[in-house]
Amino acid sequence: MPKKITHTILIFSQAMELGGVERSLLGLLDSIDYDRYDVDLFLMRHSGELMPYLNPKANLLPEIPQYASLAVPMASLLKSGQIGVLCGRLNGKLAARRFDKQHPGSKLSVTALTYSHKYTLSAMPQISDKTYDLAISFLTPHYFARERVKAKKYAAWIHTDYAALSFDRAAELAMWSRYDAICGVSEQASRSFQTAFPELSDKIQTVENILPRELTAKQAEQPQTDMPSDGAVKILSVGRFCDAKNFDNVPDICRRLMENGLDVKWYLIGYGGEEPLIRQKIAEAGMQERVIILGKKDNPYPYMRACDLYVQPSRYEGKAVTVREAQLLGKPVVITDYATSGSQLEDGVDGVIVPMDNAGCAAGIAALLRDPARMQQLSESCAKRDYTNSAEVEKIYALMED
């Protein structure tokens, strides 16, 4: 049967490294009706372990050197002749330092990331010569998709909790204002953004992350040998080793569980700049045999299937894809009470929300582990629910009809 293409879409993102945002992009690409919609995907870098899982029905546009060069050492830009990008990155780095120095605080600053795109925009070529019905910028910063793609409508995604960030409000307001629709991945992520930018309220809506059910279930069936069944309760956390995920506090929480008389092993899957800090905390807590860093895994799902409890101890989230993936696989889940936790799960029904402080977190986990019937109830509740959110793609289609 011939295609009846009604609209064209361009989706812009950065790469396909292991991460929740990237997996939700896979879910989105798998949910689109390619008989009705023509989709071009532009990635700044054709890199990452998830590249092989891109839906082949989406047309992957060629990599463009200027965009890819944002991720390489600055010294190599001089050798490759990327002078415009080099100057932009240098200017952005210096400007971000000035801004952060003038606006000190305890929140995580995203100014350097924002400026790395803002100050290199002038060096970036057009991404495509087409005019699309919709251009989606899937991951912030959102300068390039808006200014280097021709489209009738533009939409930008929010994957984080803006209340937890330090940012240049004037620069971001100007950036976000250029979009027709601003899509948060959870109700609370949308509300947090609306609090930060009330003047953009009429553009904000919620489009939940879409998860690829068949791929997740298929990958979960593969074998793993890193989490043996040795009598200990197997706890798992998956995510980047960064401040947001709070893995640096896992060793102390695990120590408290042990002191509570529980035989547990806590496995961490991921990678990132905070790994040395996490290893230091493991040593300080004496948890070398109990907190085990498994590192980067192309496929975390066999480990999710093998664990007894999935824990997301984050300081902040937009909406954690890994939590939904664990629930999709029928696992009992514990999350900390970060600002958007209420939109992540239904407390006591398909997961448990515990305090973020180490003592409270440990106490909440211990109470659950000592109640097998409750653990089973959580698993059964998860099995009855649809965590793929595949119907959310209709909201994206609607953006082109407004």
List the model feature ranges, each with a label.
Residues 22-27, 233, 237-256, 262, ...:
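A conserved mid-protein helix/loop that constitutes part of the nucleotide-sugar donor-binding site
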Residues 155-159, 163, 177-219:
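Donor nucleotide-sugar binding/catalytic pocket of nucleotide-sugar-dependent glycosyltransferases
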Residues 310-311:
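A short hydrophobic beta-strand element within the catalytic core of glycosyltransferases
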Residues 347-348, 352-359, 367-372:
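Conserved acidic donor-binding segment of nucleotide-sugar-dependent glycosyltransferases
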